[in-house]
Amino acid sequence: MAAGSPEPYPQEAPEGPCTFCVIATGEEPRDVRYEDEELLAFRNRLIWAPVMLLVVPKQHMTQQEFWISDLFAKAAKLAVRLGEEDCPDGYRILTNFGRDALQTQFHGHLHVIGGIALGLYLSHRLTAWPQVPPPG
């Protein structure tokens, strides 16, 4: 690693059990929207919008492993279905990768957020549209 480069972000929780693994096994209370042998969708305890759902694989895997897995397409379809059911006026499906994206859970997951006008995603940081140079 080059001098001055930030440490790579961890791929798993540094200590203690994985929060989403504990939730997936039912050891923690959860408000389930969908469950089968591979996936679990539940309401997030953190509430920044009226609808905040998490879609997680029951088997522990990192965000990167989840996105390249065969299970991801099934999870994405579920996220879309839940978004359509719970947020008929619009919703966001997103994932955070790493420290700069504020990833705090190192178990792969999708967020389904809506139930309110969400606005410009980075409006708190943007003062003008960024100028992106043309490729080449």
Predicted segments with their positions:
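HIT superfamily nucleotide-processing domains
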Residues: 1-136
